[in-house]
A protein has these predicted regions:
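Conserved short beta-strand elements that form part of the metal-binding/catalytic scaffold
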Residues: 29-62, 106-113, 153-162
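Conserved positions at the start
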Residues: 6, 39-41, 60, 94-96, ...
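Vicinal oxygen chelate
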Residues: 14-17, 62-106, 138-145, 150
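Short amphipathic beta-strand starts and helix->beta connectors
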Residues: 46-49, 83, 118-120
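Hydrophobic, helix-prone linear segments
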Residues: 1-48
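Alpha-helix termination/capping residues and helix-transition junctions
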Residues: 3, 25, 57, 79-81, ...
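N-terminal beta-strand motif that seeds the catalytic metal site of vicinal oxygen chelate
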Residues: 1-17, 61-63, 110-146, 150-157
Length: 162
């Protein structure tokens, strides 16, 4: 897949400790994070879905993938007609890029993983159940579908009525 491996849904958190306690009360488990970010950061997971809690000015929610060899990955995306909104590829920071779908939803690509997932039993789940999908609003279903298909996703039949 051109995006890489899915990492997390990044969320802006005004108080990371408070957010962490909230998600833990729902059955999520804290993952071990490194010092990848210059801001407070924590990750919780139910073993299937990881939520990155960032005390930073980020778009939220922000689906995030790990894309090794990010420079080359961005070249591949360009050949697919995908425009990169922002890229940081300097030696002083973690390599990352942000692109947007036709409806403006940002997606982030990181060159390296920012946490180590904990070992959880396959039977572990949060009190919320299992994560099924991440739905995005769009005014142009055809353009949005074409964008995501270029990135390797497979479209279901569109639902045109509520």
């Amino acid at each position: 897949m051109p995006l890489g491996r899915f990492l997390e849904i990044s969320l802006a958190a005004t108080d990371v400790a408070e957010s962490l306690a909230f998600y833990e009360s729902l059955g999520f488990v804290q993952a071990s994070v490194g010092e990848a970010w210059p801001h407070p950061y924590a990750v919780v997971t139910d073993g299937r879905l990881s939520l990155g809690l960032h005390r930073a000015d980020i778009a939220s929610p922000l689906p995030t993938w790990v894309a090794p060899a990010l420079r080359e990955r961005l070249d591949t995306l360009a050949t697919l007609g995908v425009t990169v909104d922002e890229a940081r590829l300097d030696d002083a920071s973690m390599h990352q890029a942000v692109l947007r779908d036709p409806s403006g939803q940002p997606l982030r690509l990181l060159e390296a993983r920012t946490f180590s997932p904990p070992a959880l039993s396959p039977a572990h789940s949060s009190t919320l159940g299992y994560f099924e999908e991440f739905a995005l609003a769009t005014l142009d279903l055809v353009a949005a579908g074409a964008f995501w298909e270029r990135l390797g996703f497979v479209a279901f039949e569109p639902v045109l009525e509520p």
